[in-house]
C-alpha cells in the first residue's frame, strides 16, 4: 500500500525557512559514534568519528558535518551543523556513558541567519529534573536518569547494537524535546544494501514510528562501520529530507567498503 501525504498550505518565505530548518534538525537524529576514555568492554566498542553527509530538502543541497570527540573528563561531545542559503544551524550534545547507557549532560541547538532560534537542555542542574529552553521560555521536565536528547538518542541504539546486535529488533527511547517528554520507537525492518558515493553498503534498516500519518522516518546503519548512519529519509506533509553519507573517518581511519 502506498502512503499518501497531503501538500502543505502556502506559507511565507520566513515560515518555509523555519520549517526547513526544523526538518533538517529532525533529520539529524542522530549523533553517530563515540570515543570512550573509560575502561571496560563497552568503552572499547565506542570510537570517535567525523562524517560528511549530502542533505537534500525541497530541491536544495547542503553539506552537513558531524563530529564525535571525547574530552579528558570522559565526556563525549557530538557536534552537528550545516548551512543552506540564509538558514543554518549548529548543535552540540554532551553526554557520558555509564553501565552501557548514555547519560545526557546538555544539549544546545542554535539556528543562524533567517531562523535565529535557540534551544537548550540541561540534565544535571538538579537531581531528577531537566531544565529546557524552548521558544524563549524555560520549562522543568522530570528526569529518570535515562532521558536522551534528540541528537544522542541514535547513539543509544548504536551502543546497544555494538554490544549485542542480535538483541535489537526494536527499541523505545525517552526523549526530552522542547517543553515535553516523548517516547521514540525504532523498529528493525531488515537488512538492505544502500548505494552511496562510497559504493554499495550493507545496512540495517530501521523505521521510526510516528502517531502522525503524514510523517515517516527511516534510517540505515552500517554494521561494518560501527553502525554509522549511511542514509536517512524523513517525510513530513509530503516533503522529504534525505541525508546520504559521502565520506567519513572512524577512529582516524578513512572508511571504505570491505
Predicted regions and their residues:
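Bacterial N-terminal signal peptides that target proteins for export
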Residues: 5-24
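Intrinsic disorder/low-complexity segments
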Residues: 34-37
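Acidic, serine/threonine-rich low-complexity disordered tracts
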Residues: 40-125, 165-258
Amino acid at each position: 500500500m502506498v502512503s499518501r501525504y497531503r501538500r502543505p498550505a502556502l506559507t511565507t518565505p520566513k515560515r518555509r525557512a523555519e520549517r526547513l530548518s526544523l526538518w533538517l534538525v529532525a533529520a539529524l537524529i542522530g549523533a553517530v559514534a563515540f570515543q570512550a576514555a573509560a575502561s571496560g568492554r563497552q568503552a572499547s566498542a565506542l570510537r570517535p568519528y567525523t562524517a560528511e553527509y549530502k542533505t537534500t530538502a525541497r530541491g536544495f543541497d547542503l553539506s552537513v558535518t558531524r563530529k564525535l570527540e571525547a574530552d579528558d573528563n570522559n565526556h563525549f561531545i557530538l557536534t552537528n551543523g550545516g548551512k543552506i542559503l540564509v538558514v543554518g544551524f549548529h548543535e552540540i550534545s554532551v553526554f557520558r556513558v555509564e553501565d552501557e547507557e548514555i547519560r545526557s549532560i546538555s544539549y544546545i541547538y542554535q539556528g543562524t541567519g533567517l531562523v535565529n532560534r535557540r534551544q537548550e537542555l540541561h540534565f544535571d542542574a538538579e537531581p531528577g529534573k531537566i531544565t529546557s529552553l524552548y521558544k524563549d521560555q524555560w520549562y522543568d521536565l522530570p528526569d529518570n536518569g535515562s532521558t536522551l536528547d534528540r541528537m544522542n538518542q541514535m547513539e543509544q541504539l548504536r551502543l546497544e547494537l555494538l554490544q549485542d546486535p542480535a538483541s535489537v529488533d526494536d527499541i523505545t527511547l525517552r526523549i526530552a524535546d522542547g517543553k515535553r517528554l516523548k517516547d521514540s520507537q525504532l523498529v528493525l525492518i531488515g537488512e538492505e544494501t544502500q548505494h552511496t558515493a562510497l559504493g554499495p553498503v550493507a545496512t540495517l534498516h530501521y523505521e521510526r514510528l510516528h502517531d502522525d500519518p503524514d510523517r515517516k522516518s527511516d534510517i540505515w546503519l552500517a554494521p561494518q562501520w560501527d553502525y554509522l548512519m549511511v542514509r536517512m529519509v524523513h517525510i513530513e506533509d509530503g516533503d522529504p529530507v534525505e541525508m546520504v553519507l559521502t565520506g567519513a573517518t572512524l577512529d582516524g581511519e578513512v572508511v571504505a567498503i570491505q
